[in-house]
Amino acid sequence: MARIAGVNLAIQKHVWIGLQSIYGIGRTRSRKVCDAANVAIYTKIRDLSESEIERLRVEVGKYVIEGDLRREVGMAIKRLMDLNCYRGLRHRRCLPLRGQRTRTNARTRKGPRKAIKK
C-alpha cells in the first residue's frame, strides 16, 4: 500500500481514484495532482515506482488536506456561531443554513422525528 498524506491508498485502484480517498482531494484536484507529478491517471497504485509516489507526495503536500482542512472547516463554523450571525444560529440549532424549507422535510439536518404528546 502506498501511503500519501497519512492515508493508505488501495493498491488495486487507479491513481486518480485512489487519491480521492484523501480528505480534501476530489476528482478535479486528483487529476491536477497527477498532471503536475507527471503520473498517468490510469496507472494502478501498485504499479507506481517510489519516485512517482514521492512526486505525488510533494504535489499533495501543496494543498490543505486531511486534519488541517477539517480543523479549518470546524474553526470557520465555530467562528460563525461565535459571531451570532444568521448562519451561526442555524448551525447552533441544527437547522438548514441556505434557505431550505423546514416545515416539512429537512429531516437529515434535524434528525429523526420527535413525537409530540397530546
Swiss-Prot record:
Pfam hit, one: Ribosomal_S13
Keywords noted in UniProt: Ribonucleoprotein, Ribosomal protein, RNA-binding, rRNA-binding, tRNA-binding
Keyword rRNA-binding in record: yes
Region listing for Disordered, in residue ranges: 99-118
Disulfide feature: none
GO (cellular component) term, any one: small ribosomal subunit
InterPro entries named among the record's database cross-references: Rbsml_uS13_C (IPR027437), Ribosomal_uS13 (IPR001892), Ribosomal_uS13-like_H2TH (IPR010979), Ribosomal_uS13_bac-type (IPR019980), Ribosomal_uS13_CS (IPR018269)
GO biological process terms held by the UniProt record: translation
Molecular function terms, GO-annotated: rRNA binding; structural constituent of ribosome; tRNA binding
HAMAP family tied to this protein: Ribosomal_uS13 (MF_01315)
Main function: Located at the top of the head of the 30S subunit, it contacts several helices of the 16S rRNA. In the 70S ribosome it contacts the 23S rRNA (bridge B1a) and protein L5 of the 50S subunit (bridge B1b), connecting the 2 subunits; these bridges are implicated in subunit movement. Contacts the tRNAs in the A and P-sites.
Subunit architecture: Part of the 30S ribosomal subunit. Forms a loose heterodimer with protein S19. Forms two bridges to the 50S subunit in the 70S ribosome.
Family listed: Belongs to the universal ribosomal protein uS13 family.
Name of the featured protein: Small ribosomal subunit protein uS13
